[in-house]
């Protein structure tokens, strides 16, 4: 069986992404053929900062020795200074993501692994950008769901990067139905669960307390869950968020759907931040990202933890092999 070819996109060049890619290249792997979509000078600078070897190869050349890294070059406008993002390089960051996505959509690649990006630097460079998840969804022309996962729990989000005051208005029947259908399909296809058990959190404290603490559960969530149960989905909820993550309850769920970002993710990150990854469900190819930021204060110092990138790469390879 041929191993999948995956794009490795480091993200913000001034952050820890490039050095994490260099660290990843020190262990040639048998589960995937990785191709970095990055600036070669930045990768060489990262290798020098870490005192590690890197040998950049043609995209189709196999990585056989520590430091071998096939490269699809993405040229930056200015040289990288670790720890200091330059808005002039925003176009290169976006070009790396879009080029990798285009190659996936064309069938030349089977998945994407992404490092952390610096949203402020991209927007300061004159490019409107809210997140890589949204960018890839727009390019593929399909709705997606953001899921974060570690070895303990998988959490999918109905809403993502919204101000808290806007969340309640965004919890609609259509949004919830779409999120749950995408999550259910991904659990079946990507994780091999024929009948996934999906817990759904309520929006309000105590899941609305029978309407006394808000009516979203009664008016929106419960009718949506009943509709999907009629389609054969195994859904639990709506559950109060403050007790849904108890270990004895989590053992009965394959995934948890949270209504908003900070409802579901703090518990996940507390339970295993280093191994956590960000998965985009619903794309025609697997995309898995690290679950940490650019860590500018660590960039170029050789002390950044590669665990999340290693976990993201291993998971993306497994998901790609199932497609």
UniProtKB/Swiss-Prot annotation:
It comes from the Bacteria. Keywords: Cobalt, Cytoplasm, Magnesium, Metal-binding, NAD, NADP, Oxidoreductase, Pyridoxine biosynthesis, Zinc. Its cofactor is Zn(2+); Mg(2+); Co(2+). InterPro entries: PdxA (IPR037510), PdxA_fam (IPR005255). GO terms for cellular component: cytoplasm. It is found in: Cytoplasm. The keyword NADP applies. It is an enzyme of class 1 (oxidoreductase). Substrate binds at residues 133, 269, 278, 287. A divalent metal cation binds at residues 161, 206, 261. Belongs to the PdxA family. Homodimer. Catalyzes the NAD(P)-dependent oxidation of 4-(phosphooxy)-L-threonine (HTP) into 2-amino-3-oxo-4-(phosphooxy)butyric acid which spontaneously decarboxylates to form 3-amino-2-oxopropyl phosphate (AHAP). This is 4-hydroxythreonine-4-phosphate dehydrogenase. It comes from Xanthomonas axonopodis pv. citri (strain 306).
């Amino acid at each position: 069986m041929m191993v999948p070819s995956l794009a490795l996109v480091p993200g913000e060049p001034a952050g820890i992404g490039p050095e994490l890619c260099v660290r990843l290249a020190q262990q040639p792997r048998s589960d995937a053929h990785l191709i970095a979509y990055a600036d070669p000078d930045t990768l060489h600078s990262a290798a020098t900062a870490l005192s590690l070897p890197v040998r950049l190869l043609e995209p189709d050349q196999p990585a056989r020795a520590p430091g071998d890294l096939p490269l699809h070059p993405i040229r930056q406008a200015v040289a990288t200074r670790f720890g200091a993002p330059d808005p002039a390089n925003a176009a290169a960051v976006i070009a790396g993501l879009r080029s990798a996505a285009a190659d996936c959509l064309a069938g030349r690649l089977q998945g994407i692994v992404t490092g952390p990006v610096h949203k402020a630097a991209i927007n300061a460079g004159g490019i409107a950008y809210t997140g890589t998840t949204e960018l890839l969804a727009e390019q593929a022309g399909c709705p997606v769901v953001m899921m974060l996962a570690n070895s303990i729990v998988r959490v999918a989000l109905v809403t993502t990067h919204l101000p808290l005051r806007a969340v309640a208005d965004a919890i609609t029947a259509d949004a919830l139905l779409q999120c749950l259908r995408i999550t259910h399909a991904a659990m079946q296809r990507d994780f091999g669960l024929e009948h996934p058990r999906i817990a759904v959190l309520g929006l309000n404290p105590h899941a609305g307390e029978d309407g006394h603490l808000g009516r979203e559960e009664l008016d929106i969530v419960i009718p949506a869950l009943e509709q999907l149960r009629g389609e054969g989905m195994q859904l639990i909820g709506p559950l109060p968020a403050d007790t849904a993550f108890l270990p004895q309850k989590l053992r009965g769920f394959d995934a948890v759907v949270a209504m908003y970002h900070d409802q579901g993710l703090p518990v996940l990150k507390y339970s295993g931040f280093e191994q956590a990854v960000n998965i985009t469900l619903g794309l025609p190819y697997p995309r898995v990202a690290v679950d940490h930021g650019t860590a500018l204060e660590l960039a170029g110092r050789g002390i950044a933890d590669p665990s999340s990138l290693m976990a993201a790469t291993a998971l993306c390879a497994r998901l790609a092999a199932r497609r």
